Amino acid sequence: DATTPMHVGSVMVFDVPKGGFDYDRLVALIAERIAHVPRYRQRIREVPAGLGNPVWVDDVKFDMTYHVRRSALPRPGSDQQLEELIARIQPRPLDRNRPLWEVYLVEGVAENRFAIITKTHHSLVDGINAVDIGNVLVDGNPTSRGGVMSTWRPRAEPSDAELVVGALADAVRTPSQII
């Protein structure tokens, strides 16, 4: 069903660390971590006339602040209030014109806590090389960190003609896909 959201989510609740944790720190953390998962800076592009499967292309307008959002619970910040927020966030479809993920920082969770809600399209988390954005965030491996994001430059988006030629070349290489 085309109206059924095809994403998965996670909810992580943390104690606020000494020194605090805020939106800017979360954006910086995600920027650092997704540098190692290029798919999180790509979006889906349809091949004209449906001549081939959709392809992944770099999002030349990638904006981290679109994907990392902020919310706050009203006092008292109960678990039930958090669950109600999750119930509002998760059913909304992801924007297919952008990379297919969102992260929400939820402040004001009772007992001096905050939550991170993730929403990721299943195409990013299915398969051998798939990595959920939640796993990227809580990865404790220091070798997975680094400044690759600052040097990333998106590749030019293919033209319609290039997509059609690519789809036709794929059809010649794998004729069983045509049937």
Task: List the predicted regions and their residue ranges.
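Soluble acyl-CoA-dependent acyltransferase catalytic core bearing the H(X)4D motif
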Residues: 9-179
